[in-house]
């Protein structure tokens, strides 16, 4: 059986995993987990590098209101819904 690789974009730990167990540990119970399986390491790495989001906290001010976003996706969704 061919080895499979897993990319976790959102989870407890982001990265490329070479087994389902480690991937599952990163995503199990994580709200909004984002992961995908690949048949080869090269494809998995390209996907991960093409979807790198800045990490850390983002602060955005919209029309006199403020809100902290803990991930870039939430930030982008708020901006695209407002404008």
Residue positions per predicted region:
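Protein-protein interaction regions
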Residues: 1-83
């Amino acid at each position: 059986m061919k080895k499979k690789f897993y990319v976790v974009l959102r989870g407890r730990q982001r990265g490329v995993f070479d087994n389902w167990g480690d991937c599952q540990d990163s995503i199990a119970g994580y709200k909004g987990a984002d992961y995908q399986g690949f048949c080869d390491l090269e494809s998995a790495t390209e996907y991960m590098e093409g979807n790198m989001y800045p990490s850390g906290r983002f602060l955005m001010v919209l029309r006199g209101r403020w809100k902290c976003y803990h991930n870039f996706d939430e930030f982008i969704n708020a901006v695209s819904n407002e404008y």
